Design a protein with these regions (language model features):
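Active-site-adjacent loop/helix micro-motif of nuclease/hydrolase catalytic cores
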Residues: 71, 111-120, 135-136
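Domain-level recognition of nuclease-like catalytic cores that cleave nucleotide substrates
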Residues: 132-148
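Short, solvent-exposed loop/turn segments at secondary-structure junctions
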Residues: 63-64, 111-112, 131-132
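Conserved catalytic cores of phosphodiester-cleaving nucleases, focusing on short active-site segments
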Residues: 84, 96-117
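Generic beta-sheet signal
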Residues: 59, 108, 127-129
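Short, solvent-exposed amphipathic alpha-helical segments in soluble enzyme
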Residues: 121-123, 141-142
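Nucleic-acid nuclease catalytic cores
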Residues: 101, 123-134
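Accessory nucleic acid-recognition modules appended to NTPase machines
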Residues: 1-94
Length: 148
């Protein structure tokens, strides 16, 4: 996958040799240390789904480069989440890449990214890399850097 995938807590905890609860605590501590960003579903009514993060990304895209892993999809999504989270609440949506303030839905991609995944969803936008100017609901990804 080109972008971060949903967290499989059971598989990850088994790989690390810890329980799921211990994994959640470790992830929470890494988030508090600002190394990771945990994204949760915000529309779920099931309290268990709120207990574990649905997606785990690095807090800052620079960490990806420092580790020598610079998948452009992950960098784009990490950048948007990092910039948006400065003053807004970011969550993991059922559709799209990022739900902001439980209202605005974003799909992240390159200049050719289409609205196919989020069409017919109100308040949805494409945050596109490699474009200088926005049009309609397509916003240049670099503009989100001004939110920081």
């Amino acid at each position: 996958s080109q972008t971060p995938s949903p967290l499989n807590a059971k598989m990850t905890s088994d790989m690390l040799g810890v329980t799921v609860n211990q994994l959640i605590k470790i992830l929470s501590l890494l988030e508090r240390s600002q190394l990771l960003r945990l994204l949760y579903y915000k529309t779920e009514r099931n309290p268990k789904s709120m207990a574990k993060p649905q997606k785990v990304i690095f807090d800052n895209p620079s960490i990806l480069y420092a580790l020598g892993y610079a998948n452009i999809g992950k960098v784009r999504e990490t950048f948007l989440a990092s910039m948006i989270s400065n003053g807004h609440e970011a969550a993991y949506p059922k559709d799209g890449d990022l739900l902001v303030d439980n209202r605005y839905l974003f799909e992240v991609g390159g200049a050719r990214k289409s609205f196919d995944q989020i069409k017919d969803i109100p308040d949805s936008f494409v945050a596109a890399d490699d474009i200088e100017f926005g049009f309609g609901n397509k916003i240049p990804l670099w503009l989100f850097g001004f939110l920081y």
